[in-house]
Amino acid sequence: MKKRFISVCAIAIALFVSLTPAALAADLANGAKVFSGNCAACHMGGGNVVMANKTLKKEALEQFGMYSEDAIIYQVQHGKNAMPAFAGRLTDEQIQDVAAYVLDQAAKGWAG
């Protein structure tokens, strides 16, 4: 009985791990599309045309406590200063996808 349970758990974990990259790629692709249509005017290439020191680069996100999906989601939903709130304009899924995209690009140095 115990061996069967362990086998079932191992299969479930293997399935989960094998499905994760495809799901992540789809989210990042959608995040890129959402970013391009809603964020790139001010944040092209991870920059910030309004507040030059508050970029979407990894170092700046870490410095300002924004290097997490939750922090970015909150910022996108609620806005701050010149940045508008997108909670009513974008779905929760779109906001989550754009947050994942921003973190992915920040980790890559916004190099593509």
Curated annotation (Swiss-Prot):
InterPro entries: Cyt_c-like_dom, Cyt_c-like_dom_sf, Cyt_C6, Cyt_C_IC
Signal peptide: 1-25
SUPFAM superfamilies: Cytochrome c (SSF46626)
Molecular function (Gene Ontology), one example: iron ion binding
Record's keyword annotation contains Heme: yes
Record keyword Electron transport present: yes
Subcellular location: Cellular thylakoid lumen
Post-translational modification: Binds 1 heme c group covalently per subunit.
Family: Belongs to the cytochrome c family. PetJ subfamily.
PANTHER family: CYTOCHROME C6, CHLOROPLASTIC
Protein name: Cytochrome c6
Species of provenance: Thermostichus vulcanus (Synechococcus vulcanus)
